[in-house]
Amino acid sequence: MCSRGDANTADAAAARRVTGLRYNMRLLIALALPCLFSLAEANSKAITTSLTTKWFSAPLLLEASEFLAEDSQEKFWSFVEATQNIGSSDHHDTDHSYYDAVLEAAFRFLSPLQQNLLKFCLSLRSYSASIQAFQQIAVDEPPPEGCKSFLSVHGKQTCDLDTLESLLLTAADRPKPLLFKGDHRYPSSNPESPVVILYSEIGHEEFSNIHHQLISKSNEGKINYVFRHYISNPSKEPVYLSGYGVELAIKSTEYKAKDDTQVKGTEVNATVIGESDPIDEVQGFLFGKLRELYPALEGQLKEFRKHLVESTNEMAPLKVWQLQDLSFQTAARILAASGALSLVVMKDISQNFPTKARAITKTAVSAQLRAEVEENQKYFKGTIGLQPGDSALFINGLHIDLDTQDIFSLFDTLRNEARVMEGLHRLGIEGLSLHNILKLNIQPSETDYAVDIRSPAISWVNNLEVDSRYNSWPSSLQELLRPTFPGVIRQIRKNLHNMVFIIDPVHETTAELISIAEMFLSNHIPLRIGFIFVVNDSEDVDGMQDAGVAVLRAYNYVAQEVDGYHAFQTLTQIYNKVRTGETVKVEHVVSVLEKKYPYVEVNSILGIDSAYDQNRKEARGYYEQTGVGPLPVVLFNGMPFEKEQLDPDELETITMHKILETTTFFQRAVYLGELSHDQDVVEYIMNQPNVVPRINSRILTAKREYLDLTASNNFYVDDFARFSALDSRGKTAAIANSMNYLTKKGMSSKEIYDDSFIRPVTFWIVGDFDSPSGRQLLYDAIKHQKTSNNVRISMINNPSQEISDSSTPIFRAIWAALQTQASSSAKNFITKMAKEETAEALAAGVDIAEFSVGGMDVSLFKEVFESSRMDFILSHALYCRDVLKLKKGQRVVISNGRIIGPLEDNELFNQDDFHLLENIILKTSGQKIKSHIQQLRVEEDVASDLVMKVDALLSAQPKGEARIEYQFFEDKHSAIKLKPKEGETYYDVVAVVDPVTREAQRLAPLLLVLTQLINMNLRVFMNCQSKLSDMPLKSFYRYVLEPEISFTADSSFAKGPIAKFLDMPQSPLFTLNLNTPESWMVESVRTPYDLDNIYLEEVDSIVAAEYELEYLLLEGHCYDITTGQPPRGLQFTLGTSANPTIVDTIVMANLGYFQLKANPGAWILRLRKGRSDDIYRIYSHDGTDSPPDANDVVVILNNFKSKIIKVKVQKKADMANEDLLSDGTNENESGFWDSFKWGFSGQKAEEVKQDKDDIINIFSVASGHLYERFLRIMMLSVLKNTKTPVKFWFLKNYLSPTFKEFIPYMAKKYNFQYELVQYKWPRWLHQQTEKQRIIWGYKILFLDVLFPLVVDKFLFVDADQIVRTDLKELRDFNLDGAPYGYTPFCDSRREMDGYRFWKSGYWASHLAGRKYHISALYVVDLKKFRKIAAGDRLRGQYQGLSQDPNSLSNLDQDLPNNMIHQVPIKSLPQEWLWCETWCDDASKKRAKTIDLCNNPMTKEPKLEAAVRIVPEWQDYDQEIKQLQTLFQEEKELGTLHTEETQEGSQKHEEL
């Protein structure tokens, strides 16, 4: 007789023989089938999940164009040209042939790796959001009637090219449009000309016609041509998304919470769940392979597979001793497979763990595996901070955070890395050398640069080390290490803190700065203070005519005759005479001097013969030389303060902060022995690496632009025709090929080797060397280069006049010398050429040969100089125009590929700037790259070139975290290893994972997709936990991700990627959850089934869950610049120019966080009209898409990644003392929120003017059909017991499509209002993973931001409650100043005493005799709640407690009870909530509400309890059911009035 045991034995044996697939399967199946048919049969059940966008799918051609645009606009325009006739997929036989045509066109511009990334990107539909954003921007224009394509000229639209001419004539009268980063701008020859935006669909004939006409206009300089995608007739298909996870969690059935209402299944396309998996392994049998080998046995194979599935799907619980080693055993099972198959096994086990666990307990674990894992774990902890069981992923050493990084960010990382690796590969750097160079940390440091303050130009007021006023202070630096209270400023007799005021005495702010200096001195702040007076330094000007010179001479006189301190006192007396709003005058100085020094002739101090003029010239020289920017400037230890920090109120505070900050720096230096007592402290400060001779904001700016120097070719600038046909990268390569360099020890070129020195710094000097400014720049560069052996320089000429022999003599001479002369001769000759007198002499007709230098071959030089070929100059000019985007004659310095400029006409860029540039390059990148290049053993000239090219490539990368080194992890026994293909660029990918964690469920499928996408050296290290005491994974999981678009058998696009749970066990109760990227808000839109309670035994075949991406979130952080604190209660609105207020939100005090719901498009962020807008103004914004000075803050949402902005606000001058929350309701009396008050009396929204005090606001949450059934009954019980208007607020996140469809109908029948509110759990707040706990979190954590400010008070009523009284009474209940009121737990039912956990332990001591309150019913005074920042306090406490998995077991209840000391609770009278579990029967008759609490003693199902406890419950239930039947009938007959209900859910959503 057959038994399940026999089947399992047979399966196990077969699994061992899995490689012998060609055994006679007919025999095996013939043996197995009798067993199979003797077992109970059951249909295979499945659950599928899909996620689509709200917007329609765009042609893949458009998305491919955006992929290329990310690489360069050049590639975009070339691709557009190449695809003019592709059209849409309608023009092709099949979708597949259209797809192939798009790929073929794109592949011409892409490397093989980039080709794979394009396929992946099209599968992800990454750029569909970009196309939709353009579509929304086009709709906002709006498009003219009946136009497939249209043009917009400065806000005027047309689709008629004839009308374009007239619009161009008047364009200058209208403002230019705001252009966005993602716009496609055609290269323009005249940036000043009008902007013409073409909205059209590429690949179509109509586009092609207009496009070519616009190109010709652009080339003529008549227009600036910008292209934006626009589809006049979009497809009706939505976009199927991927890059998310679907979890099927097993629910506890301790309390039965499943609705008994029967639902009708829907028709589902059977191909959706076809067994298409090529491997399809069950218990060792590879059914995909078997179907291929034995097609005739397909029916029997199907039955046999079904039997094996059912026999493995039993989920009997495991004993504790069986759980202990599960993590190691799973690792052993995974590592037993070879190569990529081990990833397949990891994916299969982790994603189906509940049914795999029993079999895994039989796996043996080798001692080597265990020992290696434990050894590696020491390294994991020490180097990357991982504990056993933690997971991590690194790509080329970059940490990919699995919790916060979504697949779209990961794709960006892959793409950026591909660019760098391919760049290095093109430069001939491969394999290990490539990865060593890639991991160099060469990002420019964020250091604040300082200038040297050891200058005679500074007049020091005091000196802490010698002045007698500081004699009582200790002088030892060891004092720094003595403990003090935080914030105490140490008074030590050392010049540790030096403050220099660089001022123009007659500037209006000077008086304020001097009074701050006086405050520091009089309060004995340990600051050495100095002044630099920047005054007119002309010798003709004296102090009797010029107030600035008068102040300087008066100060110098007193300093010389007495001392600096007295000189400063004189200075303050002078400025005390200056009235507010005025500036200092000569008479102010004269009157003070006459009063203080009556015996001295004032004219002798201030007049023409004054002897007190020292450091007047030096002061101006120092100011100009250091380049510190416009006056006034204040330096702290040489570092300039920001302009906004010079505000008198700010400066004092910031200086104190700086003193404390630098004290920490000195403490460390003293502790480490770097700074000792006998050292000069100022010398020590000035020898720090951040001290530079000159601060040039051009050089130090964070925004940096680099040339792409990675192309290689054999072209040169001396063939202009060939040069002009190259693309930007090709032109740059030709320029680099043609360069000859000047160096200190001579010139290295292709022919001449004077030395074998690698020079890590390369300057290309760009300018018109036939003009004085270009020559000056070259001269300064040569002067600097003579002092440094690290530098080589060469030149690119950017002529300012028409090119001819007569307009270019000097550059032609320079070029001829570089081509023909030995290095030292060329350098000396070019130095002469850079001098002004040479240019003057040449212009006067002197022969060029007159300027020859010793050792020069004059005849060879003259031969080249006089040759008529001008190709090299034409090539240089074209390069400056097309690649460097310069106007004629503009100057630029290119240092290791970094473009600095264009410089302004009169802008100084001198020897010190070159010194600073060299300094920075050597420190950040030059030396590190040089040492690696030296190891490659290439010749010197090539090596210097390589340093330059590698530096440009690496420095151009976006700044990120440092790469992590992980070479020392052992991988013999405990790691999956996949070697890369030889000879190709590869990614170095390292994963650390515990195979029985949620991270493994995501990581395994991700790595499997990556193996198909990219060439990689992959190591996956096992990081197992030992001694498990609980089942580590209690859910099934699918990660939706495909490496390429798939097609059906007839070559049509397959119905997007979906999650499939096939062959699921049928006995458990499941709940379905989606894990989506942080910024996505999704909702369930179609399924008749209860996704919170999926019970497959009651399902016919398939549960198909359809979700929709409802919103993309715009998130932000907001701060008040005056206080540095978030402006609590500030409101923002988000809208478009046509509809300014679509959504709004409130700023939290936690991190100043806010979130707004949006979708792809251009959005305008504003302060909300009312108090927010009255009190505040937006001061600055970061991460947005509009210029900093623009009135509107524009934000573009054009991808699926998170968009996080920073907004700084400032109170308006006349509102400085206003409190935002003091009267926060006025702004809500009308306007936006009123438009949401939506009654059902047929009135328009704006006519419904309810008095907000005469409405009962009731908030509730529900998930699953049973609780939604309870919720409808609760609502009915509320409505039956009150005459006051009611508005229900429901948390939208977890409501089923069925509920959302029915609620508008119910609202209309019973005449109540409702709104669906929504908030995405912020990423920075500790996440809950279990659905029930997430819902509990929403009940308490976001009350201040979930509701608009119009809501002053609301009641929370649990879904499973029955109300028996008028809730108006509770709404009007006096909370005695508390922000909320809760009912305490009953303690009258004595038999439940053993279950009252709050009566003992932690809760008993914390409550100290107070009541423990139940969260089923509460009332919140939102005005008070916000005023005392209750929401922020609750979130803060939650963040601390929730890290411990054992705390907050009843989150929504434990948190407010835990916070009673910080956020007081008003206890409501007991009769407000009666619950049979805790309250005795006698008190039931007084009950105002009855709650169907769970009973831990009886575990009675909710439905049974409801019928037994509440007599009226069944009547309510029947009434609702009748209404649902009516609704269904009307829906099927088509008589349902859907005008209101269709929009219901949208109309009522709010944040």
From Swiss-Prot:
SUPFAM superfamilies noted in UniProt: Nucleotide-diphospho-sugar transferases
One GO term of the biological process aspect: protein glycosylation
What broad class describes the main subcellular location of this protein?
Answer: endoplasmic reticulum
Task: Report the top EC class in one word.
Answer: transferase
Q: Which UniProt keywords apply?
A: Endoplasmic reticulum, Glycoprotein, Glycosyltransferase, Phosphoprotein, Signal, Transferase
- Which family is this protein grouped under? Belongs to the glycosyltransferase 8 family.
EC number(s) of the enzyme? 2.4.1.-
Glucosyltransferase as annotated region, ranges: 1244-1551
Q: What does this protein do?
A: Recognizes glycoproteins with minor folding defects. Reglucosylates single N-glycans near the misfolded part of the protein, thus providing quality control for protein folding in the endoplasmic reticulum. Reglucosylated proteins are recognized by calreticulin for recycling to the endoplasmic reticulum and refolding or degradation.
Motif span (Prevents secretion from ER)? 1548-1551
UniProt-listed InterPro entries: Glyco_transf_24, Nucleotide-diphossugar_trans, UDP-g_GGtrans, UGGT_TRXL_1, UGGT_TRXL_2, UGGT_TRXL_3, UGGT_TRXL_4
State where the protein is found: Endoplasmic reticulum lumen; Endoplasmic reticulum-Golgi intermediate compartment
Give the pathway. Answer: Protein modification; protein glycosylation
* GO MF annotations in UniProt: UDP-glucose:glycoprotein glucosyltransferase activity; unfolded protein binding
Its subunit composition reads: Monomer as well as in a tight complex with SELENOF. Interacts with METTL23. Part of a large chaperone multiprotein complex comprising DNAJB11, HSP90B1, HSPA5, HYOU, PDIA2, PDIA4, PDIA6, PPIB, SDF2L1, UGGT1 and very small amounts of ERP29, but not, or at very low levels, CALR nor CANX.
> Catalytic activity annotated for this protein?
N(4)-(alpha-D-Man-(1->2)-alpha-D-Man-(1->2)-alpha-D-Man-(1->3)-[alpha-D-Man-(1->2)-alpha-D-Man-(1->3)-[alpha-D-Man-(1->2)-alpha-D-Man-(1->6)]-alpha-D-Man-(1->6)]-beta-D-Man-(1->4)-beta-D-GlcNAc-(1->4)-beta-D-GlcNAc)-L-asparaginyl-[protein] (N-glucan mannose isomer 9A1,2,3B1,2,3) + UDP-alpha-D-glucose = N(4)-(alpha-D-Glc-(1->3)-alpha-D-Man-(1->2)-alpha-D-Man-(1->2)-alpha-D-Man-(1->3)-[alpha-D-Man-(1->2)-alpha-D-Man-(1->3)-[alpha-D-Man-(1->2)-alpha-D-Man-(1->6)]-alpha-D-Man-(1->6)]-beta-D-Man-(1->4)-beta-D-GlcNAc-(1->4)-beta-D-GlcNAc)-L-asparaginyl-[protein] + UDP + H(+)
Q: What is this protein called?
A: UDP-glucose:glycoprotein glucosyltransferase 1
Q: Which cofactor does it need?
A: Ca(2+); Mn(2+)
- The source organism is Mus musculus
